Design a protein with these regions (language model features):
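Core catalytic region of metal-dependent phosphoesterases/phosphodiesterases
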Residues: 1-79
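A broad structural signal for short, well-ordered beta-strand segments within beta-sheet-rich domains
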Residues: 67-68, 107, 183
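Proline-rich low-complexity regions
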Residues: 42, 141-142, 184
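Secondary-structure boundary elements
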Residues: 79, 182-184
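Catalytic-core regions built around general acid/base machinery
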Residues: 28-40, 165, 169-181
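Short, flexible, glycine/charge-rich loop motifs used to bind or transfer phosphoryl groups or to couple energy/partner
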Residues: 33-34, 59-60, 73-74, 119, ...
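Active-site-proximal loop/helix segment associated with metal-binding centers of metalloenzymes
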Residues: 81-173
């Protein structure tokens, strides 16, 4: 446990939910439950691009008291902070993952609804409810955060003609979320 106790641990995506059966994740939970209880830990996970969104925004959500997945735009309250959680990102390796699914159709490996979503209505509702967000946890980031260049992306774009524009749109989505939060 690295000396961590009495803590909320937020995992900012890429947990791997969807690559294995639901029983696999339940077994992990049962394996770590004793430690979560003994050290008073709660693990909350938001979706990354290497996660099936159904585990976060759909019918496969994990809702254990000390181990759970959260939907986009969930507000966590901890240590006097209001923490906004927004998952999703574009997979730069999606063509390779799609090719693997052709060879192994019984295995999930890519989800088309992976991108982050700018939900202005959800953000407006926070303002209407007088919820002041002081912490934001996301899987990807606005354009002013690292990585600020797309160096290294060009080799992936050789195999995915839409990747450059999709990652540009991803950053714009995150910029829009950031601007909205600053405005409120």
């Amino acid at each position: 446990t690295y000396g961590i106790h009495d803590a909320l641990i937020i995992v900012a995506g890429d947990c791997g939910f969807g690559f294995e059966s639901p029983d696999y994740y339940e077994d992990i939970y049962l394996t770590i439950l004793r430690h979560l209880q003994a050290y008073n830990l709660c693990i909350v996970m938001l979706r990354g691009n290497h996660d099936n969104p159904a585990y976060f925004n759909g019918d496969k959500r994990i809702t254990h008291e000390r181990w759970q997945t959260v939907a986009d735009y969930t507000i966590l309250q901890a240590c006097s902070h209001n923490i906004l959680c927004i998952g999703g990102a574009i997979s730069i390796d999606r063509t390779r993952r799609l090719q693997r699914m052709v060879l192994h159709p019984e295995q999930e490996g890519y989800w088309t609804d992976e991108a982050p979503i700018y939900d202005s209505e959800a953000l407006d509702a926070l303002k209407e409810q007088c919820v002041l967000i002081d912490t934001v946890v996301t899987h990807t980031a606005p354009s002013f955060c690292e990585l600020q260049t797309k160096r290294g992306l060009t080799s992936w774009c050789m195999h995915d003609s839409a990747l450059w524009s999709d990652t540009t749109q991803e950053r714009q989505t995150m910029d829009d979320i950031h601007a909205h939060l600053l405005r409120d």
